[in-house]
Amino acid sequence: MGSDDQSAGDRIQKGFQINYMILRDADSGKIIWQENKDFSAPDQEHEARVPVKILEMRAVSREINFSTIESMENFRLDQKVLFKGRIMEEWFFEMGFVGANTTNTWQSTIEAAPESQMMPAKVLNGNVTIQTSFYDNETLITKSVVRLYYI
């Protein structure tokens, strides 16, 4: 990444904020978990306490509401789910153009792994981190790390 890309990433990051995140049962639309916190702050590990019943759902809808001062040509996410530091799953999401001085909501659906591949909550609890890298094209804006606790 060149210094121009880095300074563009720094500029976007300064004006980028997650306002809230919501997880819903994708089938019923019922809210499972909601947090009004800026999970985009880099250089710190965030925590999320999520109801254990989320592990029993066929699919989960994730809604991210964010604001940006700078425009982005191709806003996208690279999301890794790690268990004790090892990658279990990785997803790529692309939103596209985001206008300057806007607040946006991005919703995506994540389907559960087959039941035979699921681990129990007591094994996962505190051992799972979700590492989300936010990009504009290839320019890294920020990287968020959230440790999951099942309640």
UniProtKB/Swiss-Prot annotation:
SUPFAM superfamilies for this protein? E set domains
Instruction: Cite the Gene3D superfamilies for this sequence.
Output: GMP phosphodiesterase, delta subunit
List the subcellular locations: Nucleus; Cytoplasm
Q: Which family does it belong to?
A: Belongs to the PDE6D/unc-119 family.
PANTHER family linked: RETINAL ROD RHODOPSIN-SENSITIVE CGMP 3',5'-CYCLIC PHOSPHODIESTERASE DELTA-SUBUNIT, RETINAL ROD RHODOPSIN-SENSITIVE CGMP 3',5'-CYCLIC PHOSPHODIESTERASE SUBUNIT DELTA
SUBUNIT field: Interacts with Pde6.
What protein name does the entry list? Probable cGMP 3',5'-cyclic phosphodiesterase subunit delta
- Species the sequence originates in: Drosophila erecta
